[in-house]
Amino acid sequence: MEGESSRFEIHTPVSDKKKKKCSIHKERPQKHSHEIFRDSSLVNEQSQITRRKKRKKDFQHLISSPLKKSRICDETANATSTLKKRKKRRYSALEVDEEAGVTVVLVDKENINNTPKHFRKDVDVVCVDMSIEQKLPRKPKTDKFQVLAKSHAHKSEALHSKVREKKNKKHQRKAASWESQRARDTLPQSESHQEESWLSVGPGGEITELPASAHKNKSKKKKKKSSNREYETLAMPEGSQAGREAGTDMQESQPTVGLDDETPQLLGPTHKKKSKKKKKKKSNHQEFEALAMPEGSQVGSEVGADMQESRPAVGLHGETAGIPAPAYKNKSKKKKKKSNHQEFEAVAMPESLESAYPEGSQVGSEVGTVEGSTALKGFKESNSTKKKSKKRKLTSVKRARVSGDDFSVPSKNSESTLFDSVEGDGAMMEEGVKSRPRQKKTQACLASKHVQEAPRLEPANEEHNVETAEDSEIRYLSADSGDADDSDADLGSAVKQLQEFIPNIKDRATSTIKRMYRDDLERFKEFKAQGVAIKFGKFSVKENKQLEKNVEDFLALTGIESADKLLYTDRYPEEKSVITNLKRRYSFRLHIGRNIARPWKLIYYRAKKMFDVNNYKGRYSEGDTEKLKMYHSLLGNDWKTIGEMVARSSLSVALKFSQISSQRNRGAWSKSETRKLIKAVEEVILKKMSPQELKEVDSKLQENPESCLSIVREKLYKGISWVEVEAKVQTRNWMQCKSKWTEILTKRMTNGRRIYYGMNALRAKVSLIERLYEINVEDTNEIDWEDLASAIGDVPPSYVQTKFSRLKAVYVPFWQKKTFPEIIDYLYETTLPLLKEKLEKMMEKKGTKIQTPAAPKQVFPFRDIFYYEDDSEGEDIEKESEGQAPCMAHACNSSTLGGQGRWII
């Protein structure tokens, strides 16, 4: 067997990173290895003084040297390669390298099919014809790798012969010093993996070489690293491979500076198997990186590797010493783990990332120290995973290939964070426990670079933009939303343009003015061109029908199932975004307000009330009332939530709770309650007066102190806050207070006359029906009740409305099913003749004539409205109110007048 192997030619495919050459000769390798071993021995025996002197002389000469890689690692590897070469040749035709995962089969044509069945299935089998002579059977590759190695054969032979001719001690020292100077120049530009080769300073200022570890495991890990790099080299484009080769050369030829300016050579390990495995694994790893990385990435990787290995360490006195190699087992395993993850990184890197590294990038070698803290974490993680088998490692690589396509596009340095927890271990183990200032600076620079480039490479989040647009549309369309999105139009200009359509617009809130300027001004101009006035108040039947038609048309246009989904989108969270997009796309505001001459927001409120499935559910039961009280005690005045819980509209529950919130009296009002009501209404009316009105009244009082104060008619029944009145009365709700005040006001405006009793009542009914028939309106909302009040007398409009409601309910059958014109026609044609006949009979019986109703007054003396029937009862109320001043028409209330001491109206 030994004789046959001596006839084999050496076919050694080596990675481009280390530039190991493919040599085809028989006798030179053994001789070469003996010479290297002898030279390295002589170098160790030289004195430090002689070395320092020779370094200073030869330094300038070697600056122009064409050598681009150091032969130190070559000598170390070749010196140890001869010890166990014969043992490996004694292997039979079959051989398995567990670390590299490749089974080598040396067979001839006869025993090609005689492969044993018990061989592992997760390794590659390579068949080599025995007719081809081989000297190193431990360096087989797949056919794909052999083709790549042969492509570099001519180039490798030329470089190998060139190095062999210049191999001696003098050139070794010159190369070391030259690489040391080059490393100093390129050190600030090197990337994070340059930090793997930190050196320690000796006590005398001299940095010496650490003895190479003689442990098998460490050599295995280095060998694994080289094999993985071969994989990377196969997948890399040419540009990236060139850059990676340059980086590897600089890394291998890194010398160290000792205390006395000496540059001792690196001591090669004496173990033959360790050297071989180191070479094989590094080359394999380089090939695997080449498989997964583009040209630009390989260029940067090789440059970074060269700079890493050629980094010198300067001692206290300027000497350069070799890198001390740790002799610990764990550190060697960290190198192995690092090589495996370099292989994983090359496979998993997406194309978009690969294109981001045109030159000088170190995707496979810069990962370990992108962030110092992550590297420390990875150091701990690798300790727990260092004993995993080769089978599990290969499985993880396969998974990485599958999952590599699912990665999102990260920033340049975010790719490194995927593996820095493992790859950083090798750098941290070789650097030692103490951190270096240079390392901190490098990490800081990388961190800042990462922060700057991450936003640029991060893809835009389109889903987030869509959700933001939907939310803004919801706020824009929601009836309960605030006015934060109102336009910043000039308030004065908006008021001036809107006053043409709404005379009292300046009295509205600023947010309301801006909203109407934005949403309604153009619509108002269109209605003006058509001759239609803008309306407020209760919707007419015609407007309700038009609104219903607009909603149905919009549902048909968009395909939304129901009006409840359209107007109460929050009740359907799963379809909320879709409905909101449809509203925005088909201009919901324009469709819903078509042909309705009202502000858009009032139209929207009316639509919500009309199409609310929880509205119009009839009277509240006792159980509903108790639930309402319970939910209000828990949620407060959150009427929207309470309405959803009791299946009622928010307006309905708010109105009902105002009636049952506390114990209220029913039936006839007592005198004390009546006085409280009069006082409360008076305070609320005076509180509402503007400062300008107060100044005008004050000036009139100063001119004529004896004059009687008066109050405008409309202020007695318009704009009163009945909620405040209810709070002051305490024993009645706001509806009871409003009804009772209308009764009191009518009596005092008519000076106590009974205008709707007996013959006067018949006369008022006849006059009311005739007036309603004359105005010829289509809906009750079109009636001017202020003007119609003159048909009865000097009464408030609400009094007339009450009498009309009573009239149609008594005289018109099924009035709920009739329109307003139909009701008026029935009253005029059927009821009016009967009422006139009855009135004539009564006049004949009593012998009196019909009295003409009194004309309405526009101004009333204040004391004619706000007074008490009995002053003694007022004194009793004063005692009951614990010192509160009674409200009398001729009394003086300084607190109400703001210190003026007079009633102001």
From Swiss-Prot:
Gene Ontology terms: cellular component: fibrillar center; nucleolus; nucleoplasm; nucleus
Phosphotyrosine carried by residues: 476
Region (May be involved in interaction with ARF): 498-886
Residue(s) carrying Phosphoserine: 65, 240, 403, 478, 481, 487, 872
Residue stretches of biased makeup (Basic and acidic residues): 1-16, 24-33
Pfam family, one: Myb_DNA-bind_6
Glycyl lysine isopeptide (Lys-Gly) (interchain with G-Cter in SUMO2) crosslink location in chain: 700
PROSITE patterns (alphabetical): MYB_LIKE
Record GO biological process: chromatin remodeling; DNA-templated transcription termination; negative regulation of DNA replication; termination of RNA polymerase I transcription; transcription initiation at RNA polymerase I promoter
Residue ranges, annotated region (Disordered): 1-33, 151-443
Sequence positions bearing Phosphothreonine: 248
Subcellular location, record wording: Nucleus; Nucleus, Nucleolus; Nucleus, Nucleoplasm
Keyword Nucleus attributed: yes
GO molecular function annotation: chromatin binding; DNA binding
Basic residues bias locations: 163-174, 215-226, 270-283, 330-339, 385-401
Key words of the record: DNA replication inhibitor, DNA-binding, Isopeptide bond, Nucleus, Phosphoprotein, Repeat, Transcription, Transcription regulation, Transcription termination, Ubl conjugation
Biological role: Multifunctional nucleolar protein that terminates ribosomal gene transcription, mediates replication fork arrest and regulates RNA polymerase I transcription on chromatin. Plays a dual role in rDNA regulation, being involved in both activation and silencing of rDNA transcription. Interaction with BAZ2A/TIP5 recovers DNA-binding activity.
Domain writeup: The N-terminal region (NRD) inhibits DNA-binding via its interaction with the C-terminal region.
Subunit and interaction comment: Oligomer. The oligomeric structure enables to interact simultaneously with two separate DNA fragments. Interacts with BAZ2A/TIP5. Interacts with CAVIN1. Interacts (via the N-terminal region (NRD) and a C-terminal region) with CDKN2A/ARF; the interaction is direct. Interacts (via C-terminal region) with NPM1/B23.
Protein name: Transcription termination factor 1
Species for this entry: Homo sapiens (Human)
